[in-house]
């Protein structure tokens, strides 16, 4: 019988684990079963509340037995699954500079739905390679746009909030909505400042020893975009946050907060060279808002897909740099790769007819 401690170790949110007798497990030639789950009203409720006829399933652990393959073996394995190659030598040269596991993320787009490792007819390795390079170029475009928005937001937060609350407002807990988050943010600020190799930070500490952090115009220049986002969102002065939002041509600060959170998530994906083109994002931006600038119809827009975030980036690019070519670069890239499935990125039909994109 599983102990109480073992039951607590079962993954949360998957139902309540039923006990299994050891004799049942030992009867298996290669026992892999961890526990059985039954659908319940809540993962914390006892099994007697399980819905009769509800879903139940096995949660299993298995030993990892796959062995590394050389490049020729990888190609042979892919061919056995139905993948085609225009040039195997070129494929090997690409695998030598891009790991197979990274390319495999793009190969999934050409697999039969519901079947692992079974490729659709007439699927070529080179199609996935094109997707990889498209995604790489797209990440570069998006990263550049996020950078300019990050710098602008950093400047506006430093200027507006410090004029209202002083040079060390980020150390004042009275200006925080969530006090626990305030403590976490301040701890992280001090770590990032102390870790910084910037000359102006080192020169500051050579001259001053109090307070234990530099003023906001120095400190926020060396903190991460994620931390800047947390500071802004946790700021209790909504009046100054609304002022910053309006300077960015947004109607209110909640809209700006939602957009910035999305930018942080996207930036982190890009920084780790992760696939972005067809990703579903955990943060979604507010889209159904009345904006003064050119915007989009949000009726058929999926807010958790990349298109929604690209529109937010494009809107703010027009506010910050009126002569920017971000939208043109996006359109040029899509024309360069006409086989990319725009639906997987969240692009609606006739998206180019939207006021934002004209």
Question: Where are the model-predicted features located?
Answer:
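Acidic/aromatic/glycine-rich contiguous surface patches that form carbohydrate-binding/processing clefts
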Residues: 273
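Extended intrinsically disordered or low-complexity regions, especially N/C-terminal cytosolic tails and loops
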Residues: 2, 10, 15-265, 277-358
